[in-house]
């Protein structure tokens, strides 16, 4: 049966994903940035409370995946922290300035991760040669690749996803970006064995007092009075589709 990984941005998200049938959780912060390294406090609390496998993302900032020496040093420190806290895996990725997998840095990441299962995230979708990148990551020992097939969604990138699945069993190809119940059958039909979905929704803040016109974001139009949450019904619906597909 295909694995359903749900991207979670808080303890509440993780609890809802677990309750509604997720098989694994990718733990992140900052949904507006596409996922950044969670805080130590969130890591500890989720590690203690959630029984599902949880793979934290290690990503120091938004934007591209070509990092300074200082940023990369911080990533290695975070990887060691994730390992020491006892997580079974992590999600990360680095590219060089030419859009290739940064092999020297990935070797350091793999050494720091040790026995942890490493997922190479959607930096893969920004690399110059995805076929060579798939081969390189396999040689490095990366467990899986999260990809939309180098398109804006996994549905649009189904051609490359199918090609990479046919190329071999390792690294595992996990389809992600825009995955939902409506297009999940298409991915399963293509032979995808792991899918990644945020199954997310924005909910209104519990704040009754509102101070309009003041934002904590660089975007003056950002809405401070909403929060990101996992939609449990969406998770359960996708899990139901996967379970029925098996039968």
Swiss-Prot record:
**What keyword terms does UniProt attach to this protein?**
Cytoplasm
- Which residues lie in coiled coils? none
Pfam families recorded for this chain?
CutC
Q: Which GO terms describe its molecular function?
A: copper ion binding
Xref: SUPFAM superfamilies: CutC-like
Q: For this UniProt entry, what is the primary localization, expressed as one broad class?
A: cytoplasm
The organism's superkingdom is given as Bacteria
Q: Which Gene3D superfamilies match?
A: Copper homeostasis (CutC) domain
Member of which family?
Belongs to the CutC family.
> What is the protein's name according to its record?
PF03932 family protein CutC
Cellular component GO terms, alphabetically?
cytoplasm
Q: Where in the cell is it found?
A: Cytoplasm
Does the keyword Transmembrane belong to this entry?
no
Q: Supply the InterPro entries for this chain.
A: CutC-like, CutC-like_dom_sf
Q: Does the keyword Cytoplasm apply?
A: yes
- Can you tell me where the transmembrane regions are? none
């Amino acid at each position: 049966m295909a694995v359903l990984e749900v991207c979670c941005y808080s303890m509440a998200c993780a609890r809802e994903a677990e309750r509604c049938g997720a098989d694994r959780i990718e733990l992140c912060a900052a949904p507006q940035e596409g996922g950044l390294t969670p805080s130590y406090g969130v890591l500890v609390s989720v590690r203690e409370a959630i029984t599902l496998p949880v793979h934290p993302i290690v990503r120091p900032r938004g934007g591209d995946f070509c990092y300074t020496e200082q940023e990369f040093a911080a990533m290695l420190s975070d990887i060691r922290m994730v390992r020491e806290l006892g997580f079974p895996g992590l999600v990360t990725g680095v590219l060089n300035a030419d859009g290739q997998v940064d092999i020297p840095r990935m070797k350091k990441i793999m050494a720091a991760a040790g026995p942890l299962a490493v997922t190479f995230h959607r930096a893969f979708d920004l690399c110059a040669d995805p076929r060579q990148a798939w081969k390189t990551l396999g040689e490095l020992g990366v467990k899986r690749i999260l990809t939309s097939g180098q398109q804006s969604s996994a549905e649009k990138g189904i051609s490359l996803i199918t090609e990479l699945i046919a190329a071999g069993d390792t690294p595992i190809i996990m389809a992600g970006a825009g995955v939902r119940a409506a297009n999940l059958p298409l991915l399963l039909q293509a032979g995808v064995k792991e899918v990644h979905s945020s199954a997310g929704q924005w909910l209104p803040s519990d704040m009754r007092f509102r101070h309009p016109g003041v934002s904590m974001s660089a975007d003056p139009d950002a809405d401070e009075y909403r929060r990101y949450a996992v939609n449990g019904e969406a998770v359960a619906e996708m899990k139901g589709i996967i379970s029925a597909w098996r039968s």
